[in-house]
Each structure stands twice: as C-alpha cells, then as structure tokens.
Amino acid sequence: MELIEVILSKENLNRAYKKVVANKGAGGVDGVTVEELGNYIRENREKIIMSLRNRTYMPKPVRRVFIPKDNGKKRPLGIPTALDRTIQQAISQPISDIYEKIFSDYSYGFRPGRSCHDAIRQALEYLNEGYEWVVDIDIEQFFDKVNHDKLIQILREQVNDSTILNLIRKYLKAGVMENGLEKATIMGVPQGGPLSVVCSNVYLDKQDKELEYRGLRFTRYADDVLIFTKSEMAANRVMKSISNWLERKLFLKVNATKTKVVRPTRSKYLGFTFLKNGGEWKVKPTTEKKKKLKKKVSEYLKRGRAVARPLAATIKRKRSIK
C-alpha cells in the first residue's frame, strides 16, 4: 500500500483526530476551534480526502503567536488550523513509525518512550566514564533556518511517495499570518504543528549519524546537543569540525558566541547543571529550573488539586525545591 493510502486510512485519520482533540489548543487563521472540528470534518470529509489524494489541497498559513522563554525573550510559534493540525498529525504518525527504526539511540527529543531525563542520564554516563570535556553546539535559530530543499531530499531517502513529499513541501511553504499580514516562508519549520517535530528530528538525524560515524559520544534533545570527549584538545577539534560540517552539509549556522568547549560544571543542559560529588558526576536543576518548579507547585496548590493529597506530602513537595 502506498504511503498516501496509509495516511488517508480511516484508522490513521481517526487516531490523528483524537490526538488533536486531546491536545486541545487554540484555533488557527480560519477561526475553527478544536471543538468545532468534528462537525467540519463530518461535513467535508470526502472533499478533504479527495483533495489530498489528487494534490489540490492547500494548507492555510499558520497563525503567529509568541510565548515567553526562560531567558525573558519570546519564542515564535506557528499555530496551524485545527484541520491542518489533524492532517499534519496523520502524516506524522506513519512517518514517525518509519524513522523510529533508524533514528539514533542517542536522540531523545519528542520520541515515544524517551524524555529529557533520559538525555541527562546518558550525559551522566559519559561523564562518569571519564569524558569530562563538553562541546556545546548552539545552532542559531534552528527551526527558522531549516533548508526546505535539503529536508525534502533527506525525507526522500525513506519516504518513497511523491504525493506526501509534495504535501509536506506545501506545509513548509504555507506562510505565516502575523498582525493581519501574510508572510511567505522560504525556509524553516514553524514550531507549533506536529510536522515540525518530526521534520526537525529527521533533519538532525543526519548530524546524529555523522557523530556516530566518527565514534563520538553525544546526546541530543531536539536541537540541543552535547558532545563529550576526554581532552580539551579533542573537544576543540570536534567543535570546529562539526560546526563546519553543519554549515556545509545541512546549511545551518552555528552561533559562534554560544558554541563552546567547557568543563561539565560550566555547562547547562535541558535545565540542569552538572556537579561532581564524592567522585561521581550528578545533576542539579538550574536556578531558572527551580523557579519554574516552584511556580508550578504554587499553581498546583492554588488550583486546589492538593486537597486529595495528605497535607504532609504536599508540604514536603514544596519544601523539597530549594
């Protein structure tokens, strides 16, 4: 069965719809809410499927919103329409199944059964094996700078269906609506839709494979990657070589100011810092991470969810965040 037929199968579409409804989320540029999506699909199902199959379907632009980051800056998100989120989810499910078989064991972001805590554990394993120099690669505006042609070229290696590749390219080129004005998207994968997660992992899997080919120890969560070596000289050599490779092969710009070679105690990764205690490397949350945890617990208590918990357990939970 061709991949387009797998994607358009009743089972896959229903699973995608349920996932979008469960995630809730805001509406896109067409104003259709997730709550209204079911009726819209029932009324237009055959027309939507036909347009996807014959390549006439045109995704709508994403709606630009900004969310605050821990450092005080704002992260741009692109919110697809509820229908486009469903279609993106339907595409992502079988493509994820294809790539899960070949993704690196050292890639942890947005993959089933994996988390940032697994990435941290892997980092600790390297450190406790004696790889105590860290190469912190910072890719400048990764999600905004993904090269569309290169991404499609990479996808074509595993996705042998021109209809799906054509549809993915349409989503990449769908544009962004900001302050009532539509802007073209000539590069990048807007964060906010299911496809951006899959496409970003597919793109950076090429980096993972290069690091594995070179026999390097690394851990990656989305675009956050750390490489571990046993000497400062090796770390500096790796930093220069991998930075050049990323720019030459994946057309990504490495932030020269933020990319650095450091000792583990000077490194921050996924909200944690490393420290050596009794000859063993461990982690502790950064100050920013602690603030977020305290805020979450305070909100949790305000919502009254602690009522069902023993009072002592609730107090202990809040006091444990020092």
What are these regions (language model features)?
Residues 1-42, 46:
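Non-catalytic, polymerase-adjacent accessory regions of viral genome-replication enzymes
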Residues 8-25, 62-64, 93-98, 269, ...:
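Short, compositionally biased low-complexity segments
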Residues 9-18, 174-185, 256-257, 312, ...:
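Short, hydrophobic/aliphatic alpha-helical segments
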Residues 27, 31-101, 110:
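Active-site substrate-recognition loop segments, prototypically the cytochrome P450 B′-helix/B-C loop
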Residues 47, 51-66, 70, 105-266:
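Conserved polymerase palm-domain catalytic core
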Residues 93, 137-139, 272:
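Residues immediately flanking
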Residues 101-110, 280-282:
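Short, polar/flexible loop-turn hinges at active-site or ligand-entry regions and domain interfaces
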Residues 173, 249-321:
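A conserved non-catalytic segment of reverse transcriptases
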